């Protein structure tokens, strides 16, 4: 059966094709950003009146005139999402403002996060009670030496210490946004106390078991890297090593996201195809994949990047089962809504911004960059034509089709990968400069090595850790011997080579200049219903404006 397409159809005379879910997500973001400036910078609420022309603008530019009921409904939906973002973030801010410092007191809670440093153990407590009163927030505490080896995830603690409210300023909100979204508003110092019990939590139990097995079965550095790749926990990686990995441009392999979830998704599809499950009903297959992906997302604490990738994979798989071709931009919009509707402050986290910037870069630029590669390949073949075999000549004469050559298939795979990688790096470049102060010169080269490597090893690594979790702890070393050796060999590269030597550093960029940069890239895409000459003219003008802005900022 032929697949149906649910993307918007081109509209004659309109600038772009309207995607309702994508624009709903955009207006949700607008509402969150407006509330941020309203609450932290006292921006007047009267500016909300600008919502009317803002919502009308994309509708009139992308929808045909005359369908007033449809246009009115879409207008209401966009305004509604904007207001949801505004009030949703406002609720989070109110929750923070209603918390106060307690000073010296007794408090209890359940350990939901835990990270071990050299001389301390940091825990996050949920279900918090202070002096017997329930609190609608979480607390960070650094445990005393007496509790270092006694506490695990989901343990219940009764402690005494000095509890203070964490100060969160607008200027440093991006660094605090992750904890803000988790409602971690309090910090306890000079802590003493005891463990009082344990409450079972499936996700925390699986997370703790995986960490324990990995630490028991592998050497220190390979274990830290394995925890990062599988669980997104980079706390155990030695600081110098992690900094070198960052400058190599591949730190994203430790932020569990589309690369990891996509590998797990592909493995699930392989299981369905190669086992008796292939004969089961499509609904059962979908629920099997959904349960596996959601279970993994839960073990990773439902981080924004994991939720985004999970939603996109499930939407794509559902579309395949019901024979409807899905739209990547719509899926991205849906994933953003699923995250921001519950925790609007996630918008300001670096991980969320980098994750979605990379995906939007792929959606907008991968195809145009691939077309540039194809034009280059055509030009090369013009001067260096391929010699056709007798079978190919015979097929041409008989007007038959031949399967592509191995060299052609290799070119397609390599060009597709390079186009995707370049597109993601182009869109994330301003964020890397803004938050980290550099852009790696090694990124493209090392991504060509490590992205396929992680894609290939991830499922194997997950299977081996799962098997080790099901077996006695004493056998973990034997089960995890292979990944331990592989990581030890791979990490030698980052011990030997200093990747900080080739990076663009010391360059400043502002939010306004970043927007001009993004506008320039968007005009070079095929998402506009404009003549190519006009798109390139507008894109060139934005490039010039970007260059002028960067020179002005960095002189």
Regions found by a protein language model. Give the residues of each.
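Hydrophobic alpha-helical transmembrane segments
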Residues: 51-53, 258-269, 510-523
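Hydrophobic alpha-helical transmembrane segments in integral membrane proteins
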Residues: 82-104, 544-555
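Short, surface-exposed secondary-structure edge patches
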Residues: 96-103, 146-151, 201
């Amino acid at each position: 059966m032929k697949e149906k397409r649910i993307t918007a159809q081109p509209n004659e005379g309109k600038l772009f094709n309207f995607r309702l879910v994508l624009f709903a997500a955009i207006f949700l973001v607008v509402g969150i950003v407006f509330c941020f400036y309203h609450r932290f910078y006292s921006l007047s609420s009267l500016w909300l009146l600008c919502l009317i022309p803002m919502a009308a603008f994309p509708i009139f530019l992308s929808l045909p005139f005359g369908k007033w009921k449809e246009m009115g409904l879409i207008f209401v939906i966009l305004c509604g999402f904007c207001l949801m973002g505004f009030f949703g973030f406002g609720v989070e801010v109110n929750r923070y403002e209603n918390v106060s410092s307690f000073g010296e007191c007794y408090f209890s809670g359940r350990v939901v996060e835990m990270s071990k440093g050299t001389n301390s153990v940091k825990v996050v407590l949920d279900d918090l009670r202070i002096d017997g009163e329930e609190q609608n927030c979480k607390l960070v505490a650094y445990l005393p030496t007496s509790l270092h080896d006694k506490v695990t995830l989901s343990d219940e603690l009764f402690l005494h210490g000095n509890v203070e409210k964490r100060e969160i300023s607008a200027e440093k909100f991006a660094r605090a946004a992750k904890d803000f979204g988790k409602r971690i508003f309090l910090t306890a110092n000079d802590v003493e106390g005891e463990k009082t019990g344990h409450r079972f939590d499936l996700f925390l139990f699986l997370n703790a078991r995986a960490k324990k097995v990995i630490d028991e079965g592998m050497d220190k550095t390979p274990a830290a890297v394995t925890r990062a790749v599988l669980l997104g926990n980079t706390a155990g990686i030695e600081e110098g090593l992690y900094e070198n990995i960052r400058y190599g441009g591949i730190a994203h392999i430790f932020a569990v996201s589309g690369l990891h979830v996509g590998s797990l998704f592909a493995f699930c599809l392989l299981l369905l195809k190669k086992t008796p499950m292939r004969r089961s009903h499509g609904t059962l297959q979908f629920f099997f994949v959904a349960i596996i992906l959601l279970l993994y997302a839960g073990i990773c604490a439902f981080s924004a990047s994991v939720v985004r990738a999970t939603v996109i994979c499930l939407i794509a798989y559902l579309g395949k089962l019901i024979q409807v071709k899905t739209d990547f931009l719509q899926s991205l919009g849906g994933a953003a809504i699923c995250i921001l509707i519950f925790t609007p402050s996630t918008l300001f986290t670096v991980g969320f911004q980098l994750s979605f910037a990379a995906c939007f870069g792929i959606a907008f630029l991968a195809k145009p960059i691939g077309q540039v590669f194809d034009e280059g390949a055509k030009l090369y073949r013009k001067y260096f034509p391929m010699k056709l075999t007798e079978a190919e000549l015979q097929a041409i004469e008989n007007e038959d089709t031949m399967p592509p050559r191995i060299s052609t298939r290799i070119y397609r795979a390599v060009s597709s990968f390079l186009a995707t990688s370049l597109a993601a790096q182009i869109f994330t470049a301003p964020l890397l400069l803004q938050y980290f102060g550099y852009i790696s010169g090694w990124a493209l080269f090392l991504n060509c090595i490590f992205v396929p490597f992680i894609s290939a090893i991830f499922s194997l690594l997950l299977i081996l850790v799962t098997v080790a979790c099901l077996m006695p702890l004493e056998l973990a070393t034997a089960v995890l011997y292979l990944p331990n050796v592989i990581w030890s060999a791979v990490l030698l590269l980052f011990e030997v080579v200093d990747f900080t030597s080739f990076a663009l550093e010391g360059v400043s960029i502002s939010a306004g200049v970043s927007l001009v940069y993004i506008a320039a890239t968007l005009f070079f895409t095929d998402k506009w219903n404009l003549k190519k000459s006009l798109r390139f003219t507008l894109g060139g003008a934005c490039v010039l404006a970007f260059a002028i802005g960067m020179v002005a900022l960095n002189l």
